[in-house]
From Swiss-Prot:
Binding site for K(+): 129
Keywords of the record: ATP-binding, Coenzyme A biosynthesis, Cytoplasm, Kinase, Metal-binding, Nucleotide-binding, Potassium, Transferase
A GO term from the CC aspect: cytoplasm
Molecular function via GO: ATP binding; metal ion binding; pantothenate kinase activity
The protein's annotated pathway: Cofactor biosynthesis; coenzyme A biosynthesis; CoA from (R)-pantothenate: step 1/5
Domain of life (superkingdom): Bacteria
Record carries keyword tRNA processing: no
Subunit structure comment from the entry: Homodimer.
Compartment(s) where it occurs, according to its Swiss-Prot or TrEMBL record: Cytoplasm
Catalytic residues of the enzyme: 109
Binding annotation for ATP: 6-13, 132
Sites where the protein binds substrate: 100, 107-110, 184
Protein name: Type III pantothenate kinase
Amino acid sequence: MILVIDVGNTNTVLGVYQDETLVHHWRLATSRQKTEDEYAMTVRSLFDHAGLQFQDIDGIVISSVVPPMMFSLEQMCKKYFHVTPMIIGPGIKTGLNIKYDNPKEVGADRIVNAVAAIELYGYPAIVVDFGTATTYCLINEKKQYAGGVIAPGIMISTEALYHRASKLPRIEIAKPKQVVGTNTIDSMQSGIFYGYVSQVDGVVKRMKAQAESEPKVIATGGLAKLIGTESETIDVIDSFLTLKGLQLIYKKNV
């Protein structure tokens, strides 16, 4: 079995693969302060509930956009799993040709998503990832990572309304009953929900106009199902795209 770990700014997602099958997965709040021992105790609790033991894991692969966490995570892997983890970054084979001005600027999560999209859905493709930031990545018909778009995430915008507008409450992100709200909460939910649906469709349509052929659009991330089901442009919703990409990259490098 292999353990795949996707460390995002808001959430950390873990999965366990048995060959090609994702048999367990968990979503945790990202914590920058934990030691390797604290991480190990968290993972042990999850494993106990799933009937797993540390020695069941033969390999570990990590994608992270939070550098301060990496030392503790690496030490946890070595101390408790007796495994040196594979870290997505320079020197790791992905098969991806990145056409960014500076390829080092492309986040590990975006690389992993692109690899998964190519392998599972073909190319050209656009990957929309609803994370702390909402990212859009274009893989062109030459199988190249052609570039993308980065926008504020849904949670960032929602929290900004709450913190910067003194009379507006903190709200749950949900699809409202109708577009025109008749109270503050419904109106805010409508603005957030339909505003982001419209953002996705607008950005994707403009990216498609720049592409040389028609790309398939894949959505992933914590809010992919909520926004993706209302979108006119999203073709596939794959909540586990990043975990699948980590497993695919691990296979390419062992």
